[in-house]
Amino acid sequence: MQTISLSTHLEASQQVAWDVISDHSLYGSFTGTSQVTLEKQGTPHTNGVGAIRVFHVGPIRIREEITTFEPPKQMAYRVLSLPLPLRNCRSDLLLVPCEDGGSCILHWDSWFELAIPFTGGVLRRVVAAQLNKIVAGIAVEVALRAGSAS
């Protein structure tokens, strides 16, 4: 099992950060995908448990199912389909408020198994680079929303 763990400080409250990470429609702006659609609504929230979101990257489709949805602190998902030789991909996102009340820490942990032996180093770097890009995009989007809320 491969593991990638990232943490970043977000310049916004836990609620503002939650509003960004839990809304599938915003992911297109910071994931490098052309569009993110909702294939199936979750319960009880549209983006909640059971929701299936689809990331469109040209002809490529990545499908994810939300498995945990606990506003405003935790969301988890598992990858249903991915054009990489990976299996059992899942991620957990946790927002921890800072003592100042105006910022929080995003912890993003991802796990996956290799479908092709001996590809761990390369695939781990590819996945880590993409997750770093997404987390950086989330930080920018959260800061913009925090600024407009002031």
Can you annotate each of these PLM segments?
Residues 1-3, 72-74, 101-105:
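A generic structural signal for beta-strand entry/edge sites
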